Each structure stands twice: as structure tokens, then as C-alpha cells.
Swiss-Prot record:
Ranges of residues in domain PAS: 386-458
BP term (GO), one: nitrogen fixation
Keyword set, alphabetical order: ATP-binding, Cell membrane, Kinase, Membrane, Nitrogen fixation, Nucleotide-binding, Phosphoprotein, Transferase, Transmembrane, Transmembrane helix, Two-component regulatory system
Annotated GO MF terms: ATP binding; phosphorelay sensor kinase activity
Protein name: Nitrogen regulation protein NtrY
Location(s), subcellular: Cell membrane
UniProt xrefs under NCBIfam families: sensory_box
Region (Disordered): 727-771
Physiological role: Member of the two-component regulatory system NtrY/NtrX involved in nitrogen level control. Probably activates NtrX by phosphorylation.
Domain of life: Bacteria
InterPro entries to which the protein is assigned, alphabetical: HAMP_dom, HATPase_C_sf, His_kinase_dom, HisK_dim/P_dom, HisK_dim/P_sf, NtrY, NtrY-like_N, PAS
Amino acid sequence: MTQAAFDQASDNGPMTPSGSSFGLFAPAVVLLALISALATFLILMGLTPVVPTHQVVISVLLVNAAAVLILSAMVGREIWRIAKARARGRAAARLHIRIVGLFAVVSVVPAILVAVVASLTLDRGLDRWFSMRTQEIVASSVSVAQTYVREHALNIRGDILAMSADLTRLKSVYEGDRSRFNQILTAQAALRNLPGAMLIRRDLSVVERANVNIGREFIVPANLAIGDATPDQPVIYLPNDADYVAAVVPLKDYDDLYLYVARLIDPRVIGYLKTTQETLADYRSLEERRFGVQVAFALMYAVITLIVLLSAVWLGLNFSKWLVAPIRRLMSAADHVAEGNLDVRVPIYRAEGDLASLAETFNKMTHELRSQREAILTARDQIDSRRRFTEAVLSGVGAGVIGLDSQERITILNRSAERLLGLSEVEALHRHLAEVVPETAGLLEEAEHARQRSVQGNITLTRDGRERVFAVRVTTEQSPEAEHGWVVTLDDITELISAQRTSAWADVARRIAHEIKNPLTPIQLSAERLKRKFGRHVTQDREIFDQCTDTIIRQVGDIGRMVDEFSSFARMPKPVVDSQDMSEIIRQTVFLMRVGHPEVVFDSEVPPAMPARFDRRLVSQALTNILKNAAEAIEAVPPDVRGQGRIRVSANRVGEDLVIDIIDNGTGLPQESRNRLLEPYVTTREKGTGLGLAIVGKIMEEHGGGIELNDAPEGRGAWIRLTLKAEGPKAEPTDASTKATGAATPAAPAASAMARDAAADSAARGKNERT
């Protein structure tokens, strides 16, 4: 829109007030409606001589409803005019609505408060009549009377059962001497305070009646449910309008004969019961009509509120017309500025006073905005170009990059940092880095007080049970301001450190194996030659001679096996894989360890067969190392807390993997630096070589599997899990079909011989290695 078009659209003249067409009619209607609303409120509150009867309430409701309709028509006409003006593009329509809304809010709040106060006053008055305490009193009075009657019913039940038992024993008297029987019946009735006692038949005819002189004769009711009575369960009869309670029970050993008794109830209690029941019925009837009264008053309050609200809206509509003429031009110009047209100018009329100054200020503002927009657009293009370049660099680097503000809160987190820390950007943003990664607190504090621009160091993080070592560098952002941020970079050097340690220890192992292995063969050959050449010539202490030579040979073998471990770790042979049965390997290994450690209970749960491709010798070595470590860990537990040593070996197939779990109740694994136990020469035992788990880990890695170190699920101990690829179709985990507890499984003679040798070696060495 050009400036000329804007001036033409904005200079259409002021809006004329609607009062010119209505004259004094509209203000008079508003005034009368407000007077009617006030009078209605005073009548309802009881502040006038007029009693708010049903007829009065209906009358004032109709009068106020008519006032609401007239006011609605007047307000609707004004709103229609505003809508018509808005359709023509006049911005003043919005201002009209806002001013009307302001008037409505200002008026509706006190109207609502008055309605709420009146409603609360009415509710408080009704609540005093229908409070829970009043309801409880009325209901309790009925309950007390009914409880009294029920108590009589329970008492008469016990009396009739006792009396029935006594009369059953008197059957012979009944058949031989009816006169004496009647005397006994009368005495029984008098003794139990039963003024009515008689023997009746099923057809309700009376056979015998007790002669209790009370001046009243009891009649058997025709609706007595005599057929429902049993010898152990009498029928209790409570007539509605009578002043007694009765009961009937069949007599055992009597032919079609029933005992019917009755006891009087205090007639005042019966009268009270009827009175309380009638009172309760009247009370509930009043309570049912309570809602109607509340609805009528609520409608009246709503009508009063509508009158006040509509009157305020009408006043707001007319008052706003005198304000919108000078403001309309500013609003229209502001709309053009919002659409991006900063060349618009508002005409200035000095007669408008302060609004003219506002228009002049508006024109200055648009001029400044136009200049600043051009500068901002230029700077935005430069910043956007740098942002895209920075995002591309951060997303492509392998190191984790974290940006911090002056309060050490995270502002930037690239994908590598999310992956290394196991956090999402949503979880980490705007949180303190020391809170997200507490291990960096020391470096952050050092960087804050350091003179150099960057500080670096290594930290160890444990996430999901895994320890990782990171090289961390904290760099201070250069800024002329006193407050500045930091850039933190993280590099995962765990594998690098592990590879360096493994390489260094492999070289050490190779040298140790070379230096120790050379003298072993001559020592062993010399001991065997001594035994073979001089054994038959030794006649004295021959047993000691054989024991010494055997010990030398066995110890040389132990040292040789230790050297073999060094050599195996230094030069681990490539596995020669072929199809094998893992279940058979586990059973044989468990059998050997069970014989070598009879003090430990070995539980094995393995399927009948688990085919896989692996090197039989290497996997057997790995299982033996794990089981030996478990047994020695149990031996390391102090005897007073050890209890029964137990090792559980289970295996099953999960998907495409074979999973072998070894759980013991030994000393367990350390919580800190647990993953370092898989590195060479890292051990928690004084005499341990630190190669057992390292060799196991290497064997599993060569087979495409892995090893996990966990705590035992129950109590103390360790849980080692070995995984390697299975052979054959994928299967779900199967229940173990082989389970042994302490007893040895059948094995070949060669296996038994190996087991005996292993047991002897274990007893001789007495090693205590746990890695």
C-alpha cells in the first residue's frame, strides 16, 4: 500500500456514536435493567419487605429475562456494526473488542463475586437443615429403634431353641399326662418371660397353649412362614404394626408339632419407631426439593450477572468509539509495519494532543527500524554462513565436543559427545557439566584458575558397567568480556591404552618365557634320569627318594605350564575351528574340576547338545581358567563365613549365540577398575600372574565372542558370562537337561586319569590365583 492510499484509508472521519439513532432509549433501558437487577438481588437477600416466595421469584425472573433480551439485542446491534466496520478494513474494530472485553472483565468480577456470595449464603442456610450431622441424627434414631427390635428377635431365638430342647425331652410326658405337660409348658414360658407359648400344627391349629395370665391372648398369624423353620433355625416373625415379636420351630421327635412363642415389646418403642420413620420420610422429601430451590436461585443470579455484563459491554462499545478515531491510524500503520512495510508514515494532527506526539514518535521509530533492518540482514547472512560451517565441522569430527557458557552449563553437544557419554542432547542441554559428568569437575576448576588458555588430563568414566578412559581438554573461549565460556573435547583412548599395555606385556611375557624355559628341560631330564638309574639301587628311604624326584618332576611341569601361559599370551595361536559339541566340553571340564576340588559343589545345567564351531583346546583352556579362578576364590573366603562353596555352570542358546554362565560364591570381583582385569598382569591376588582372564578374553575374541564380568545375582561371588557364535538354526533358550549336584558324571578312563593328576597337582601347588 502506498502512502497516499494509507492516508486515504485512515482519514475516513470519526465513527458516530450510536446514541444519535437511539436517543435516550438505549441509556434508559440500560439504567432500568441495572435497577431491576439490583432490586432482584435485594429481594433474594431478604433486604426488602417483599418475601421471596415462589410467585415473586418467577415474576422477577421474567422481568429480568426480558431485560436480558433487550440488552442482548442492543449489544448485538453494536457488535454487528463493529463487524461491518472490520469487514471494511477498519482497525478500530479490534480496539472496540478489547475495550469491551476490559469493561466486561471489570464488571463481571464483582457480579460473579456477588453471585458466589449469594449462592454460598443460600447453601449455608440449606446446609444447616441438611447437614451430615442432622442426617446422621435422624437416621440414627431409626437405627436405634430397629436395633432394639432386632435385639428382641435375637433373644427370642435363643429362648425358643432352649425351650424346644427341653420339650423334646418331655415327649413321654406329652403322650402320657397332657395336664402335667401343660403345667411344664406354662412354667417354661413364665421362666423365659414368654407371655405367648403354644404348640401348633402345620395348618396353624393350636394343640397346647401355656396358661400365662397377662390379660391378652396371642393369635397365630396367618402369614407365618412355618414351613421355613428347621429344628436348628427357627423362623422369627416381626409384624409391622404389632407390639410383639414371635418365633416358631419344629419339635424333634414330635409328629407335625411346632413350638410357637411370642414376647411383648414396649409399645413406646414401637411408637418412637413409627415417629422416627415418618420424620425420616419427611426429611428426605424436603431434601429432594432442595435442588429445585437451588436451581431457581442459580438462574436468578445468572440473569443478574448477565444484565450487569451486557450493560458494561454496551457502555464499553459506546465509550470506545470516542477513543478509536486517532488510534485507528496508528493501528493501521502498525499492521503495515508488521507486514514489513517500513516506509509507511502516520499523518500528524496537532489537535489530537498527546496522540499527535505518539504519531510523530511512531514515524521516527519506522525510520530507525528501516535502517536497523538493513544492518541486521547483513549480519544475519554472515552469522548463518559461519553457523553452517561450524555445525558441519562438529558433526564430522570423531572427538566429543561440548560447549559451556560462563556458568559451566552445556550449550552445545555434538553427536560424538552424545555417543561417548551415553546422553541425548535433550537430557544434557542447559545442565552443569559437573552434574552430567562429575569426573570433569577437577579439570573445570583447574581451567577456571589456570593462566594458560587450555588444560588437559585423563578421566575414567563408568557407563553401563564399562570403564572408559578419556583424554579431556578444556579450552577457554577468547572474549573481551569478563564472563566467557569453555570448549571441552573428549577422546576415547581406552582401546589405545589397552593395546599399549597388551603390547608391552606381551614383549615382557616373551622374554620371561625364554629365560625360564631354558633350564627347565635339563632339570626335568636330570630328575627322571636319577629316578630311572639310581632308583633300583636305593634301598634305604626309597619312598622319600621317589617322592622327592616326583616332586621335582611335578614342580618342573607346573613351572612349564606357567611358562606356557606366558608363551600362550605372548604368541596366542590362531584357533583351529571345527564342529564341536559345547555341552560335552562343559561336562568334561566340570568333571575335572569337581575331582580336583572335592570340597566345592559344582552344579551344571547344560542341554544335551550345543553344536558350535570352535577350537576345542582353547575353549577348554578358557573354561578351565574360569572354573579354577572360581574355586580358588571360594578357598580365599575366610572359613568362618565361607559356608558351602558352590559353583554353578549353565549354558543355553540365545538367538545366534551360545551363552555360558559361571556363578560362584567366592570373594567376588572388585567394583573399581573391573574391566582392567581383562588386561595382562592385572590381578587382585598376591600370587596371581594376571594372565588367566587375559587369555580367556583373547580366546573369546578370537572366536568372535566376548566375556562379561558381573557380580553374582544373589549374595557374594562373581558371575562370568562367555559368549560365542552357535552353529545351526536359531533357537530360543532351552532348559537344562543335565543337572548334577556334587556327584561325578561318567567319563572316559583317560579323563579320570587326567582328573587325578589335576587333583594331585592342585594339592601340591596350593596356588591362590584370582584374576
